[in-house]
Amino acid sequence: YARAIKETFGTDFNVLFGPAYKGIPLTVAATMSISEMYDADIRYCSNRKEVKDHGDKGILLGSPIKDGDKVVIIEDVTTAGTSIEETLPIIKAQGDVDVLGLVVSVDRMERGKGTKSALKEISEKYGFKTTAIVTMADVVEHLYNKPYKGKVIIDDTLKAAIDAYYEQYGAEE
């Protein structure tokens, strides 16, 4: 994540935001890595699915988001953009902030609501950058007809099924 974030956004931001639940450990780990690898002072913030009224109260974990912050969102995958639609109002409710974009680990390369990929639709709808560390095409290429511990993970039969799936549901770009 740290390298993908740096390559896409530099270090000209100050908050990484990870939507609950998977985004919480991703955000903490990425923030630590960016700090260590690039000597950048980046804070992290995540939301909870439900507000707590004890301990660390509220809907947010980590550093508060405040006016003037520049935020990058990180997630594991994005399929239809639903999580972003839920996340942006939470971030924007914290103050006058600039959401710079979204980094995901895997671009599933599936259509969003139209024929474009969900990541492309998100980028166009919200006017910010989106990037993925790897695509499903990268994963398939890496595993196709290559043995792992004596077994081929993606053989010709599975590759044909994957190709058929993407023919029907894959983004057209």
Task: Enumerate the language-model features and the residues they cover.
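Active-site-facing substrate-recognition patch
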Residues: Y1-G10
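A contiguous pocket-lining binding segment that forms or flanks enzyme active sites
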Residues: L60-R111
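Structural detector of well-ordered beta-strand residues that form the stable sheet scaffold
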Residues: L16-F17, C45, L100, T131
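Nucleotide/phosphate-binding catalytic cleft detector across ATP-hydrolyzing
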Residues: F9, M32, E173
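Short, well-ordered alpha-helices that flank and scaffold nucleotide-derived cofactor binding pockets
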Residues: R3, M32-E36, P89, A93
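Short, glycine/charge-rich flexible loops or terminal/linker lids adjacent to PRPP-binding catalytic cores
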Residues: V28-V71, T82-E85
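Short glycine-rich phosphate-binding loop at a beta-alpha junction
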Residues: T11-K22
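PRPP-dependent phosphoribosyltransferase catalytic core
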Residues: A93-E173
